[in-house]
Amino acid sequence: MHRRKCLRLLGATGAALLLAGHSPYRQWDVYRKTRLVLLASATDETSVRLAQALAAIFARQLPDSRAILARARDTNDLVRLVASGQLEVAILREGEAHAVLMGAEPFADNGSVALRTLGAIGDHLMVCVEEVPKPAAYLLVESMAERWHDLDAALVGRASGPRPPQSLRVPLHPGALEYYRGHS
């Protein structure tokens, strides 16, 4: 009888280990940690086009980043992915980014998310969570600035680079600030 309990326990343990190996969540965790995933809301065509163009720039300029675009179903899903720490970099309209930072409607159910600005692109901001390392943020801004002319003029407006205006309501990431101070 003791032998049966041991065999059941071993069988259950083996099954649990085998099933755990097929969890898509672990694969997603590894996937997103080995790539720069630029998140955009599928409901905002401009942000999708910007994220797509920026992902291509980062893939060329920073090949080790393995940059890709990911589309969230809508802006609220985008905010949830960033707030939960699943993804770190996104393209948002400035008003939306400010609402996320303040924990205001329509994103209040996610609480306040400590977003930081990397760059301004037309009416949109490229934002990240404040935990993004300073050197990584610097490299992203530098790459974006160096290849600014590759972005569609209709997307960037009259801006000559990604430097945000002084009136920005979402603070700059320290790595971005360092880049802009050295390249004024």
Give, region by region, the residue ranges found by the protein language model.
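N-terminal export signals
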Residues: 5-25
